[in-house]
């Protein structure tokens, strides 16, 4: 059964794959991370216990760590400033009061290693999103430098589509595209260097950006979590293999092997797969923040 978050006195204005948004006023909203899990763009019936709390802690850690690179969606307000105590107590570890921003209509993906849809593109064309890459790269090869590979932002339930940088410029304008690319690569580079010291390789990640009321580019949503990124362990990494990741890969692999057709409804995921997934999320938090 899909996890239901507590009913709050604030008005719900959006329900996404993982997060629900509530209106506070015209400048702020409350973002609440559920324990829902999506795989192949379908939301699973079975929640992953404590996932929303772990994701929120990882995101908050990175928002603070990367604040010197660019502004973020934090307002400085506590959930207790905007909700009655009995409601705030229920969601305090999975909720953030954030600025209302105008989201930029692309997925800002940065890749430092070759895998996933990028590997498929490379095998077919020698490029990713129109960017030429060296010959001879294999699964999990480290790229010569981090690359910005945007995709279109599709509605929930539709697959995002990789686009070229020129298409990105058409969608959001050349000036904004240049800012987004520069900031996304800077964020990834700093985070990846830090994570390596903690035994984690950040293979790739997706950033979400918005514009504030003054048109300032602002980092929003979630940052460098196992949901928005592929984390690999330094200990098990080897180019030419598909390294295990700190995320929903257990669930994805189980679903891939289950014969499921990737349409709702989703088959029931075994308890041991769910527990392994919780453990991996927790391990990522522990490694990054200790």
From Swiss-Prot:
EC number of the protein: 6.3.2.6
UniProt keyword terms in alphabetical order: ATP-binding, Ligase, Nucleotide-binding, Purine biosynthesis
Biological or metabolic pathway of the protein: Purine metabolism; IMP biosynthesis via de novo pathway; 5-amino-1-(5-phospho-D-ribosyl)imidazole-4-carboxamide from 5-amino-1-(5-phospho-D-ribosyl)imidazole-4-carboxylate: step 1/2
Protein name: Phosphoribosylaminoimidazole-succinocarboxamide synthase
Family assignment from sequence similarity: Belongs to the SAICAR synthetase family.
An individual GO BP term: 'de novo' IMP biosynthetic process
Gene Ontology MF: a single term: ATP binding
CC per GO annotation: cytoplasm
Pfam families tied to this protein: SAICAR_synt
Alphabetical list of CDD domains matching this protein: SAICAR_synt_Sc
Reactions the enzyme catalyzes: 5-amino-1-(5-phospho-D-ribosyl)imidazole-4-carboxylate + L-aspartate + ATP = (2S)-2-[5-amino-1-(5-phospho-beta-D-ribosyl)imidazole-4-carboxamido]succinate + ADP + phosphate + 2 H(+)
Enzyme class: ligase
Lineage of origin: Bacteria, Pseudomonadati, Pseudomonadota, Gammaproteobacteria, Pasteurellales
InterPro entries xrefs: SAICAR_synt/ADE2_N, SAICAR_synth, SAICAR_synthetase_CS
């Amino acid at each position: 059964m899909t996890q239901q978050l507590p009913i709050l006195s604030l008005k719900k204005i959006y329900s996404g794959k993982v997060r629900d948004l509530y209106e506070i006023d015209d400048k702020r909203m409350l973002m609440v991370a559920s324990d829902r899990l999506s795989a192949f763009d379908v939301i699973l019936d079975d929640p992953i216990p404590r996932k929303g709390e772990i994701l929120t802690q990882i995101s908050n850690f990175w928002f603070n760590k990367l604040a010197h690179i660019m502004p973020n969606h934090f307002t400085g307000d506590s959930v207790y400033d905007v909700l009655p105590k009995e409601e705030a107590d229920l969601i305090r570890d999975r909720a953030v009061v954030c600025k209302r921003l105008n989201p930029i209509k692309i997925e800002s993906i940065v890749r430092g290693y070759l895998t996933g849809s990028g590997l498929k593109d490379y095998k077919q064309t020698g490029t990713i999103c129109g960017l030429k890459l060296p010959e001879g790269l294999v699964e999990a090869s480290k790229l010569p430098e981090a690359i910005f590979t945007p995709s279109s932002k599709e509605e929930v339930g539709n697959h995002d589509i990789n686009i070229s940088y020129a298409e990105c410029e058409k969608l959001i304008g050349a000036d904004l595209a240049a800012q987004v690319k520069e900031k996304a690569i800077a964020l990834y580079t700093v985070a990846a260097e830090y994570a390596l010291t903690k035994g984690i390789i950040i293979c790739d990640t997706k950033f979400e950006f918005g514009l504030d009321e003054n048109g300032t580019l602002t980092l929003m949503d979630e940052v460098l979590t196992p949901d928005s990124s592929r984390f690999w362990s330094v200990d098990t990494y080897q180019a030419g293999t598909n390294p295990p990741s700190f995320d929903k890969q257990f669930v994805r692999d189980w679903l891939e092997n289950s014969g499921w057709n990737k349409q709702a409804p989703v088959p029931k995921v075994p308890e041991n797969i769910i527990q392994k997934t919780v453990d991996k999320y927790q391990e990522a938090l522990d490694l990054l923040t200790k």
